[in-house]
């Protein structure tokens, strides 16, 4: 059995930054550190940080006065930000800069009284945070998930209308929704640069290349990870059997027993150690040496807040 690895896969710059913010805060200030929502959607990462003293909460009211609070990589609404500001808290923002870019687009539309449409998945924390940047009652903020949603949507003024997207969506599905928006509202204005982030796009391109060669595709990522789910769905659309797994222990030998080639990738919030564990598990089932496919190089780095720019090893 051949083992192929997608390239790129795993951590993106936004996830790296968010985890570093929590790790550095723990090193500098000591436990406990409070984090609103899971800092990234990966069980292994969250459990590891929890063991080191991070406390994950959903409501600001759960945080005691004088504590350190970190916003997750998914971002928060302006209401949450204001609530935290009203408290005696030290706040660090781990929102991915590419999510912040979308927040700024929505806030700009709100200030102008223009209506905005967000393409995204209802209930996802990134969507809640992005929708929560809009506050102008003269305009309006709407959420759509599919072309069908677009055709039933009514707005106040089609001449002052813009759209944005969640950063972790399926590129293909989003393209279909954008096409519907442009047909339904010919004057709608989109972002100058695509809101779907580079890491989401690159990992979807990589899983396409992987699925062209593999019989079975394993996507390492947690069930609540939007970008990981999109990778598994894309492989399935290409006619491959695909499984979304948290770690190597999830793999059943029956999944790969008849496969000549198994492809492995990982969502943007999944650490490489989980991929290495999957490779080891597949080798127990008769797999050979893992081969990494050629792919797009990524060299983007997002800085942590200056107060947290410290070599953790020096603190420890």
UniProtKB/Swiss-Prot annotation:
It is an enzyme of class 1 (oxidoreductase). It catalyses: isopentenyl diphosphate + 2 oxidized [2Fe-2S]-[ferredoxin] + H2O = (2E)-4-hydroxy-3-methylbut-2-enyl diphosphate + 2 reduced [2Fe-2S]-[ferredoxin] + 2 H(+); dimethylallyl diphosphate + 2 oxidized [2Fe-2S]-[ferredoxin] + H2O = (2E)-4-hydroxy-3-methylbut-2-enyl diphosphate + 2 reduced [2Fe-2S]-[ferredoxin] + 2 H(+). The keyword Metal-binding applies. Its EC number is 1.17.7.4. CDD domains: lytB_ispH (cd13944). Its cofactor is [4Fe-4S] cluster. The active site is at residue 126. Isopentenyl diphosphate binds at residues 41, 74, 124, 225-227, 269. One of its GO terms (biological process) is terpenoid biosynthetic process. GO terms for molecular function: 4 iron, 4 sulfur cluster binding; 4-hydroxy-3-methylbut-2-enyl diphosphate reductase activity; metal ion binding. Pathway: Isoprenoid biosynthesis; dimethylallyl diphosphate biosynthesis; dimethylallyl diphosphate from (2E)-4-hydroxy-3-methylbutenyl diphosphate: step 1/1; Isoprenoid biosynthesis; isopentenyl diphosphate biosynthesis via DXP pathway; isopentenyl diphosphate from 1-deoxy-D-xylulose 5-phosphate: step 6/6. The keyword Lyase does not apply. It comes from the Bacteria. InterPro entries: LytB/IspH. (2E)-4-hydroxy-3-methylbut-2-enyl diphosphate binds at residues 41, 74, 124, 167, 225-227, 269. GO terms for cellular component: cytosol. Catalyzes the conversion of 1-hydroxy-2-methyl-2-(E)-butenyl 4-diphosphate (HMBPP) into a mixture of isopentenyl diphosphate (IPP) and dimethylallyl diphosphate (DMAPP). Acts in the terminal step of the DOXP/MEP pathway for isoprenoid precursor biosynthesis. Belongs to the IspH family. Homodimer. NCBIfam families: ispH_lytB (TIGR00216), PRK01045.1-2 (NF002188), PRK01045.1-4 (NF002190). This is 4-hydroxy-3-methylbut-2-enyl diphosphate reductase. It comes from Salmonella typhimurium (strain LT2 / SGSC1412 / ATCC 700720). The lineage of its organism: Bacteria, Pseudomonadati, Pseudomonadota, Gammaproteobacteria, Enterobacterales.
């Amino acid at each position: 059995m051949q083992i192929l690895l997608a390239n790129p896969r795993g951590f993106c710059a936004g996830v790296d930054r968010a985890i570093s913010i929590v790790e550095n805060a723990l090193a500098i200030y000591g436990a406990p550190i409070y984090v609103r929502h899971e800092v990234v959607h990966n069980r292994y990462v969250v459990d590891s940080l929890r063991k080191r003293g991070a406390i994950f909460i959903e409501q600001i009211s759960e945080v005691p006065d004088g504590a350190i609070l970190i916003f997750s990589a998914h971002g928060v609404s302006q209401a949450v930000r204001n609530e935290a500001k009203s408290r005696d808290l030290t706040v660090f923002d781990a929102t991915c800069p590419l999510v912040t870019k979308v927040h700024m687009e929505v806030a700009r539309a709100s200030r102008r009284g223009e209506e905005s449409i967000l393409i995204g998945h209802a209930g996802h924390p990134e969507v809640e945070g992005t929708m929560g940047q809009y506050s102008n009652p003269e305009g309006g903020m709407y959420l759509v998930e599919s072309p069908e949603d677009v055709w039933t949507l009514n707005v106040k003024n089609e001449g002052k209308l813009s759209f944005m997207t969640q950063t972790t969506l399926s590129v293909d599905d989003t393209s279909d929704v954008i096409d519907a928006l442009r047909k339904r509202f010919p004057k709608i204005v989109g972002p100058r640069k695509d809101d779907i982030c580079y890491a989401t796009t690159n990992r979807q391109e990589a899983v396409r290349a992987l699925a062209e060669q593999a019989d079975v595709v394993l996507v390492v990522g947690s069930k609540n990870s939007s970008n990981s789910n999109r990778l598994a769905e894309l492989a399935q659309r290409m006619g491959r059997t695909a499984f979304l797994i948290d770690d190597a222990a999830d793999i059943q030998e029956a999944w790969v027993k008849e496969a000549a080639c198994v492809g492995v990738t990982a969502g943007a919030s999944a650490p490489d150690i989980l991929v290495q564990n999957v490779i080891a598990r597949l080798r127990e089932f008769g797999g050979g040496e893992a081969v990494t496919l050629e792919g797009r190089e990524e060299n983007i780095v997002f800085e942590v807040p200056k107060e947290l720019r410290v070599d953790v090893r020096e603190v420890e």
